[in-house]
Amino acid sequence: SKTPIHLYRHNVFVDLVRSQTGIWGIFAGVLLMASLYNLLLYFGIKDRVYLVYIGYIISAIALMGTVLGFGFYLWPLEWQLFIHEKIIVVNYTIAFFTLAFCTMFLRYHKDRCWRYKLSVGLLWLMLVLGTLSFFIPENIAAPIFFVILGLLYIVCFILIYNKLKSGFRWAKFYVFSWVPLIIGAAIQPLELTGVITYSFSIRHAFLMAILCEIVLMAMALADRVRYQRERALYHATHTQQTKLLNSAKLKYAFMALKAQQRSTTLCLVKIRHFNSLNTI
């Protein structure tokens, strides 16, 4: 690490602390509000993906609170020191929830295909290695984690690409959420190794990237709910075998015409031995 040491005048330092506190407060406030909101959604919808999303948010707060230091304002000193000592475990936690959210959001737990089994296998591997990291020195656990991180990106891209190829257009916000995460994750090590010159914005680039990612993930969840409602309405108004409007939709349309007192003629035709449009 090539973290620089800067000497500030008193007024400049006060402005720096004020700016840092402000951006930390925005980050923690937005994420905590998102957690509470999604907890309410879980109680209403009973979809476990919201619990996974909350787990990811809490892990992100713990990670950034330890890396940047604002965790001292959020929880007791003993907790902050313990999290700092077990920072690799926190990294495994956020990686675990990242893959779990990707799997459940894209509904692979419904498909049970080989991609789902690949995801579950990596989740179990991260769970085991994360547990072992409580007892392994950081200088040994860190290189292992970076290997797992590479596998995580590969598996997530496989899951996302397959769904995009099959027409999961409502997942566009989730795909976009990976862009700031990848950019922010690349900037932080470049800054720590001296490749990129240190600045206030560079120092907090990963924090802002996570904030943008979580906002886009929330938008993706909202888009997912909208899609599920549209599908539920479609199934309620269409016959699954023929893909044609069913009697419920016909009754609704006919009653609407009657309410408008419009002259209407209803003609019913029965086709024998008809199962689908392909049999005509």
Where are these regions (language model features)?
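Extracytoplasmic
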Residues: 1-43
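Hydrophobic core positions of alpha-helical segments in small-molecule transporters
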Residues: 29, 52-55, 144, 176
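Juxtamembrane interface at the cytosolic side of transmembrane helices
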Residues: 36-59
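Interfacial "cap-and-anchor" motif at the non-cytosolic start of specific transmembrane alpha-helices
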Residues: 59-104, 109-233
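Conserved nucleotide-binding and Mg2+-coordinating catalytic segments in signaling enzymes
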Residues: 232-252, 269-279
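Cell-envelope/extracellular polymer assembly enzymes that use nucleotide-activated donors
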Residues: 265
